[in-house]
Amino acid sequence: MAELRSFIFLSRLQPQTMCYLGTWIRGSLPRSHVAAQVIEVAPGLDIEPLTDVAVKHADVKAGILVVERQFGYLEIHGGTDEVQAAASAVLGALGATARDASRPEILASTIITKLDPQQAFLVNRNKIGSMALAGESLFVLEMRPASYAILAANEAEKAARIKLVDYRMIGATGRLYLSGSEADVRQAAEAAEDALRDLG
């Protein structure tokens, strides 16, 4: 029986969160403001039959289907009703409810103010999203399960005018990097952490 590690419904994918996905996903590219569902399970291969259920049950598109060392990931998107119908079908196949998903745990969270040019350079070497600039504030957040990084990114983007530098939602832990003015970064950080704590 698969372990449901996350079951994340996003009612409206925010533009930067969506565009970041577009830099690496191999499936159907979502558009901003569509609904999305992210599912993480263990063992990883159990995501394959769940994908079959989701895409056959409703008119949704799959953007992510990844099996990595331990965990499997699926992201589907489309209209709200279709995404929720597909997600419900997946829960039915698992014999689970959304409440059975693992709760997010914040492992690390910090804000670095007045980012040094050297650190900005190093952060930007490893990113896919926007660039962190010297003098900006940088927020970094790490959590597990990893897929909760997309929820944190989406909620941070809703809350403040920030730049999404990077988020990693696959693996042992998830990570989020965002930058901007100190006030905006603090507001976004609070929104990201609150979104995770609300599920805890």
Q: Where are the language model's segments positioned?
A:
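Surface-exposed interaction/gating patches
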Residues: 122-165, 179-181
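Short glycine-rich or small-residue beta-strand-to-loop segments that form or flank ligand, phosphate
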Residues: 33-42, 70-79, 136-142, 173-181
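Intrinsically disordered, low-complexity polar/charged tails and linkers
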Residues: 1-41, 45-48, 57, 103-128, ...
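Solvent-exposed alpha-helices and their adjacent loops that cap or buttress functional pockets
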Residues: 28-32, 55, 64-68, 130-133, ...
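Flexible, glycine/charged-enriched surface loops at secondary-structure junctions
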Residues: 60-68, 98-109, 162-170, 199-200
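Short amphipathic alpha-helix segments
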Residues: 44-58, 147-159
